[in-house]
Amino acid sequence: MHNAPESVFNALVPMVVEQTAKGERSYDIYSRLLKERVIFLVGQVEEHMANLIVAQLLFLESENPDKEIYLYINSPGGSVTAGMAIYDTMQFIKPKVSTVCIGQACSMGAFLLAGGEKGMRHCLPNSRVMIHQPLGGFQGQASDIAIHAQEILGIKHKLNQMLSHHTGQPMEVIERDTDRDNFMSATQAVEYGLIDSVLTSR
């Protein structure tokens, strides 16, 4: 029963059949799209998902370091450390990474959306974006809680600096606007500088 969710997922993923010189070859739809340099970041941002995204980015760089990569994002956010692993890899690799929000890009999802190549960050018309300050929770001795409180304040400051860099907004504006959940439409995200354009068609 341990593998039941994975089996159900695999059963629901469409397969694509291609004719090759050696006969038919079948791919799951995500592997086929990876051949077109399309990566999907869907769901909660956590360590396992981050490792898969990082691996795909590195693989596509090895395949062609000069051709852009398309990262489609539909995420409510998640772990800061997992998200930073993806973000740092996006900045590290040679290919330009175009980000596209489909559905929603919230919290760390919004941060990764903004971290795409300048001029290549997009939303579809009815998607939404949300920015806020990082969340944290810790139990333990008072001195350890104080240490973790300082750490999350440091993370908050770093993320605000990076959002300021990617959006062009002053730090004081970012600090004010991330104090609470701040939802934006696709058009508002363009005005804010989180993305560069709203895509309505190819």
From Swiss-Prot:
GO CC entries: cytoplasm; endopeptidase Clp complex
Enzyme class per UniProt: hydrolase
EC number: 3.4.21.92
Residue ranges of the TM segments: none
Domain of life: Bacteria
Active site: S107, H132
GO BP term, pick one: protein quality control for misfolded or incompletely synthesized proteins
A GO molecular function held by the record: serine-type endopeptidase activity
InterPro entries found in the cross-reference section: ClpP (IPR001907), ClpP/crotonase-like_dom_sf (IPR029045), ClpP/TepA (IPR023562), ClpP_His_AS (IPR033135), ClpP_Ser_AS (IPR018215)
Subcellular compartments: Cytoplasm
Catalytic activity annotation: Hydrolysis of proteins to small peptides in the presence of ATP and magnesium. alpha-casein is the usual test substrate. In the absence of ATP, only oligopeptides shorter than five residues are hydrolyzed (such as succinyl-Leu-Tyr-|-NHMec, and Leu-Tyr-Leu-|-Tyr-Trp, in which cleavage of the -Tyr-|-Leu- and -Tyr-|-Trp bonds also occurs)
Chief localisation class: cytoplasm
Coiled-coil zones: none
SUPFAM superfamilies reported in the protein's UniProt record: ClpP/crotonase
Pfam families: CLP_protease (PF00574)
Keyword terms: Cytoplasm, Hydrolase, Protease, Serine protease
Disulfide bond entries: none
Protein family according to the UniProt entry: Belongs to the peptidase S14 family.
Function description: Cleaves peptides in various proteins in a process that requires ATP hydrolysis. Has a chymotrypsin-like activity. Plays a major role in the degradation of misfolded proteins.
Subunit relationships: Fourteen ClpP subunits assemble into 2 heptameric rings which stack back to back to give a disk-like structure with a central cavity, resembling the structure of eukaryotic proteasomes.
Protein name (record): ATP-dependent Clp protease proteolytic subunit
Organism: Shewanella amazonensis (strain ATCC BAA-1098 / SB2B)
Gene: clpP
